C-alpha cells in the first residue's frame, strides 16, 4: 500500500516539478510543524516517504545547513532556515506597509492585530502579528499555520478567494467586507476580520483582531469594526486598490 501511494505521488509531482525537491520540502515542512526534534520514523509518518528516501535527502539538507542532527537520531531545522527568514523579513515590502498601521491600531487600544493569507485549501498563514497592550489568550505568532475553515480571517479568505465559497454567511461577508468568529478556533477566543485588496481589487489577505471572547460583546465589535475597516481600507489604497465599502 505504501509503495502504491508513493509511486503515484512521484508521478504526479514529476509532471509539475522536480520530485526530489518536492520531497525535500515535505521533510522541511514536517520539521517546521513540530516544536521538538523528530526522528526518522516520525518524519516518515508525517511525509509518507520511505526512511531510505528520507535519509538520502536529509544528508543533502544537513550539508546545506537546512537541517541539523540532534542527539544522533533526531533532526531539527538548521541555521540556513533562520538566515532565509531574516532575508525574507528584510526584503518583504509588505512588512514596511503593514506593521506601522498595525502598530497604530495597538497604540489606539485595539485587540491583537494579525494579517493572514491563504496557504492551501485548508490552511492560512499568519504573515504579520502584533500583540495588544491587554492580556490575551490568543497565542498566535507570525509564521503560524491555522485552519482556513475556522476563525474570522479564514472566513474572509474563503469569501473573497479565487474560488469564493457560497452560502448566506459568505454573502453577508462579501456585502459588508467583515467577518466575526466567536469561539470557533478556540472556545475562549474571538475575532473579527476584513479583507485587504490590491490593484483590480484582487484579494491579498485578511486583517484581523483577536482576543478573549469576553471583550467581543456587541458594542465592542461595533467599535472595532470601524477601526478594522478603516485600516483595511488604508492598506488597500496604499496597494492600489479601491475599498468596496
Where in this protein do the model-derived segments appear?
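Short hydrophobic/aromatic beta-strand element in the GNAT-like acyltransferase core
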Residues: 114, 181, 193
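Amphipathic alpha-helical effector-binding/dimerization core
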Residues: 76-163
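N-terminal helix-turn-helix
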Residues: 2-89, 234-238
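Residue-level recognition of short loop/turn positions
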Residues: 121, 176, 199-200
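Glycine-rich acetyl-CoA-binding "A-motif" of GNAT/NAT acetyltransferases
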Residues: 203
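A short, hydrophobic, proline-anchored segment that marks a local hinge/packing element in signaling
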Residues: 192-199
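Juxtadomain coupling helices with adjacent low-complexity linkers
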Residues: 164-171, 175-182, 187-188, 206-245
Amino acid at each position: 500500500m505504501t509503495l502504491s501511494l508513493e509511486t503515484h505521488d512521484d508521478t504526479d509531482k514529476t509532471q509539475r516539478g522536480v520530485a526530489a525537491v518536492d520531497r525535500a520540502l515535505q521533510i522541511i515542512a514536517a520539521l517546521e510543524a513540530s516544536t521538538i526534534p523528530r526522528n526518522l520514523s516520525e518524519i516518515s509518518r508525517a511525509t509518507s516517504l520511505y526512511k531510505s528516501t528520507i535519509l538520502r535527502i536529509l544528508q543533502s539538507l544537513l550539508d546545506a545547513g537546512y537541517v541539523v542532527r540532534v542527539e544522533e537520531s533526531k533532526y531539527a531545522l538548521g541555521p540556513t532556515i533562520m538566515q532565509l527568514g531574516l532575508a525574507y523579513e528584510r526584503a518583504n515590502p509588505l512588512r514596511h506597509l503593514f506593521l506601522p498601521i498595525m502598530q497604530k491600531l495597538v497604540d489606539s487600544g485595539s485587540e491583537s492585530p494579525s494579517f493572514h493569507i491563504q496557504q492551501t485549501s485548508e490552511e492560512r498563514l499568519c504573515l504579520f502579528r502584533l500583540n495588544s497592550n491587554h492580556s490575551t489568550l490568543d497565542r498566535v505568532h507570525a509564521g503560524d499555520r491555522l485552519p482556513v475553515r475556522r476563525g474570522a480571517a479564514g472566513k474572509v479568505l474563503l469569501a473573497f478567494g479565487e474560488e469564493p465559497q457560497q452560502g448566506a454567511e459568505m454573502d453577508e461577508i462579501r456585502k459588508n467586507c467583515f467577518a466575526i468568529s466567536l469561539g470557533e478556533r478556540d472556545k475562549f477566543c474571538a475575532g473579527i476580520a476584513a479583507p485587504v485588496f490590491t490593484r483590480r481589487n484582487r484579494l491579498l489577505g485578511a486583517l484581523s483582531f483577536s482576543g478573549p471572547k469576553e471583550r467581543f460583546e456587541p458594542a465592542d465589535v461595533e467599535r472595532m469594526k470601524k477601526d478594522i475597516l478603516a485600516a483595511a481600507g488604508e492598506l488597500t489604497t496604499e496597494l492600489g486598490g479601491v475599498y468596496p465599502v
